Amino acid sequence: MPLTTYTAGQVLTAASLNANFAAAGGLQFIKAQTIGTTVSSVTVTGAFSADYDNYLITVTGGVASTSNNLYLTLGATATGYSYAGIYVQYSSATVNGTATNVATYFDAGYGTTNTLSGRIELESPFLAKRTIFRSNATSSTTTTFMNNYQGFLNDATSYTAFTLTASSGTWTGGTIRVYGYKNS
């Protein structure tokens, strides 16, 4: 939609201003959720809707009680997750691979005593079809890893919520942010 050009003395209507300043595309912020104190999981509700097909979830700040992984599940589904990917330990030049087609979660990030890290993309979690998953994360200690994983959830369920669960220990602080990729 072209922008309206105004001249001196012209009356500006709310409709015209809203049309000029509406978001044009890209990422649209949906919600942020603060991670509590010494929690082993966090459920984010109202994350997915018919407004967007694809989503970005970030996990930043906070700390873990011990080095752990961030496991992501959609709704109450605890089966049917398949993913594969690579990971590298910072103290080694060896690239490692992993794959599973019977997982109960997606491996979505890392937690250390310094920070929590996760960047997760989901395609079609609200649509009643398979959800595609991509994640990459890094940790802030030399004895831990960076990863890049991709996979899917083998079902045709519409989801509005997700849960992040610590593989061990707990988390304190940090923020989970959810963004929608604008459909255009």
Language model segments and positions:
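Surface-exposed molecular-recognition determinants
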Residues: 3-4, 8-10, 14-17, 22-184
